[in-house]
Amino acid sequence: MGTVTHEMLVHGFLEDSNLLEGVGAVYVLACDFLQTTQKYANRGYRYALLEAGHAAQNAYLWCAEQGIGVVEIGGFNDKAFSDLISLAYPHQAPLTTLLVGRRKL
């Protein structure tokens, strides 16, 4: 997968580079839809979205407990972002991202 630089994130994912100010890590919650739908048929798609939401919520709760800022970003170009992080789109795709380390607003 390799390293994704600040510039790559801005051009391939975020339009507002200010969102990355103070960010220590970017977590991408992604899914391999071939895996989930093979086991659960069409429900696999819904399950993946639910699980991503649960994981993001748990990350928010942990960050709040630790006093760490976190921002969830779900609005991005799926194909461009998948290419940036080497996912085999559309079978693999990012569902949401968490920018961790931002100061609390």
Regions found by a protein language model. Give the residues of each.
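Acidic, surface-exposed loops and disordered segments
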Residues: 1-105
